[in-house]
Swiss-Prot record:
Protein family membership: Belongs to the plant acyltransferase family.
Name of this protein: Epi-neemfruitin B 7-O-acetyltransferse L7AT
Gene of this entry: L7AT
Superkingdom field: Eukaryota
Species this chain originates from: Melia azedarach
EC number, as in UniProt: 2.1.1.-
């Protein structure tokens, strides 16, 4: 089921970027991050036209949909002009209007055939428009964003949008997708324009110390070996039961994200105990969207890496679920409006270095790190270009000795309200233990088909 590349091109904005906007300065929070393309993948079946079975008609409709995607990009890029540019260096993006990198690919089998494969999720790397080589080496001249649209026999379609983490976070890419949808559906006037104030709120540092970067923080937790990803689906009923189980006097009404995070943390920590023979200090981290912490609130369409990591250190004791929820809630609450304000203005760099120093100290106290990133409530399952919502939304699966630091979990919504699909990335030997965890199996289904 190898995709055939039909075309590669650059799609340019419909209007030229003004001269005073040609250079987009990265903000201080962007400098803390690093370049790596992260993908959002949307899967659309051809079930909106149930009475059509003629291949010629199906191909015509799919061709129209593909053209709609391409023709609505230029106007979208005029608003999100850095997406059509290239990375200049660690300080700026050259908004040169060269265009967003766009790949069209085709698969001869159906989308249903893809979902019927064993471990299909670990084969979706075929839908991404970048090479692993672009994750290392020089970043100068790399596209800020890339898109691949893959069409399938009988009308299925997959859209993969990728963004460099040096430029922005998941909210940034999500905002672009929503604006693209508004343009495609002829509602461009209703689309909110991106807010590019981050570089003035969080002024960059021309000489930025390498030790104060997220990459350096994570170095102690990079592992060599074979990595695998598995998906664990928690349906609404299981989450309701789990929330009842983890509730306590400290956190009386835990969120579904907190409840699922606590369970996965304990199960992974139990897997480590089975591997090493005893509990070891573990650092639990959760990425926090700081736009909602600002006073006043920052616009949700604020571009950049407006996120920080909440850290909770778990020592050698046997972890209880309610205790883990309490630790996570306390850590997340520390990423508040005052913390965000401390990173702004002339004192922002010194305060960021102090925060990075504190995080580094926590990292040195832990033997392993479990990293959570929640994409829940992004609205990705509602991305409708005019032919219906996606049947599934995913990130990228892995299976092999790929560059990765282990123990990473991405939490995502499904098309059914209240569910969470957790993408878990571990060393294969750790995953083999986790898959057998009876407590996890009681609440979650592993690797279900979205069909």
């Amino acid at each position: 089921m190898e995709p055939e590349i039909i075309s590669r091109e650059s799609i340019k904005p419909s209007s030229a970027t003004p001269l005073h906007l040609k250079t987009h300065k990265l903000c201080l929070l962007d400098q803390y991050r690093h370049h790596a393309y992260f993908p959002i993948v949307l899967y659309y079946p051809f079930n909106q036209e149930p009475n059509i079975s003629d291949p010629t008609q199906i191909n015509h409709i799919v061709s129209e949909r593909l053209q709609l995607l391409k023709q609505s990009l230029p106007e979208t890029l005029s608003r999100f002009y850095p997406f059509a540019g290239k990375i200049k260096d660690n300080l700026s993006v050259d908004c040169n209007d060269e265009g967003i990198y766009f790949v069209e690919a085709r698969v001869k089998s159906s989308l249903s055939d893809y979902f019927n494969q064993p471990n299909f999720a670990n084969a979706n790397y075929k839908f991404i428009p970048f090479d692993v080589k672009e994750l290392s080496g020089s970043i100068s001249g790399l596209h800020v964003a890339k898109i691949q649209v893959t069409t399938f026999a009988y009308g299925g379609l997959v859209i993969c949008a990728c963004l460099s983490h040096l430029f922005g976070d998941g909210i940034t890419l999500n905002s672009f997708l929503k604006s693209w949808v508004a343009t495609a559906c002829k509602n461009a006037e209703e689309a909110e324009r991106p807010n590019n104030d981050a570089s003035s709120l969080f002024p960059q540092q021309e000489i930025y110390p390498k030790e104060a970067t997220w990459t350096e923080m994570c170095k102690p937790f990079y592992r060599d070996g074979r990595f695998v990803s598995r998906r664990f689906l928690f349906d609404a009923k299981a989450i309701a039961n789990l929330k009842d189980k983890v509730a306590s006097s400290l956190v009386q009404n835990p969120s579904r994200v907190e409840a699922v995070s606590a369970l996965l943390s304990r199960c992974i920590m139990t897997a480590f105990k089975g591997k090493f023979g005893s509990h070891r200090p573990i650092l639990l981290t959760h990425t926090v969207n700081m736009r909602r912490k600002a006073k006043p609130l920052m616009p949700e369409y604020s571009m950049g890496n407006i996120v920080w990591t909440a850290n909770a250190l778990c020592t050698n004791e046997e972890p209880e679920l309610d205790g883990l929820v309490g630790k996570l809630r306390e850590a997340i609450m520390e990423i508040n409006g005052d913390f965000l304000k401390s990173l702004q203005g002339d004192e922002g760099f010194l305060n960021l270095c102090e925060a990075a120093k504190n995080e580094s100290a926590l990292c040195s106290s832990a033997v392993e790190r479990i990293t959570f990133s929640s994409w829940c409530n992004f609205g990705l399952v509602d991305i409708d270009f005019g032919w219906g919502k996606p049947i599934w939304v995913s990130t990228i699966g892995i299976d092999g000795p790929v560059p990765c630091f282990s123990n990473t979990i991405i939490l995502m919504d499904t098309r059914l309200k209240g569910e969470i699909e957790a993408w878990v990335y571990l060393l294969e030997e750790d995953m083999n233990i986790l898959e057998l965890d009876k407590e996890l199996i009681a609440f979650a289904k592993m690797d279900p088909s979205p069909m």
